[in-house]
C-alpha cells in the first residue's frame, strides 16, 4: 500500500461546529431549492474572539439565475440573512457574517460564475489541499496533508486512516471523563492496512 500518517480529533469546538453547519446549510437541498442562484462552491472561514464568532462566506453564484447586478445584490442579501439567522443560533454571544465580501458593485465586480464553481476561473487547487475527511481545514488541530481522495478510492491509507483516526477519536472522546481526544495512525509500506506502525491516542480530561 503506502506509507502515510493520519490524524483525527474529537469533539469539534463551537467555532468548528459553526463553520461546518454553515457550509452544510448553504449546500443543503432545501437551501438550494430556495436559493438556486447559490452554487456548490462554498467556503467558510471562522474566527473566534472570546464570545464572538465572525464567519466569512465565499459562495459562487450561478449567472443563469441572476438577471442583473441589482438582482445579484438582492439575492445575496436574502441568502446572507438566512446564514446570519443560523449563525445567531450557534451559541455565541455575537455572530457576524459576511458573504462574498470581495464584491465591488461600483465597478461591476461580483462573484458570478457559469457553473457555480470557482474552478472555471482556474482556481482548482491541488489534491490534498482541500477539506479533511471531517469537512474542515483546521490549522490549529493535528492534521495531515494526505488527500482523502488521492491515489485510489479503495485501499488508499490516506483516506482510510484519516477516517479511522477520526472515528477512534470520537469513540474515545465519548468515554466518561474525557474532554478531548486525538488519534494518530501511521502505515508502513508493504504491511497490511490493519497493522499500523503507530496507533497513538492522546486524551485531555
Where is each model-derived feature located?
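Glycine-rich, mobile lid/loop segments that gate access to catalytic sites or pores
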Residues: 1-93, 97-101
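Alpha-helix N-cap/helix-initiation motif
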Residues: 11, 150-161
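Conserved active-site/ligand-binding neighborhood in enzyme cores
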Residues: 23-31, 84, 91, 104, ...
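A short, glycine/Asx- and small/polar-enriched loop/turn
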Residues: 49-53, 105-110, 192-198
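Short, hydrophobic beta-strand segments
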Residues: 53-66, 145-150, 196-205
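A glycine-rich, aromatic-flanked flexible loop/lid motif
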Residues: 109-148, 186-195
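Structured, hydrophobic secondary-structure cores that serve as assembly/anchoring elements
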Residues: 154, 160, 176-205
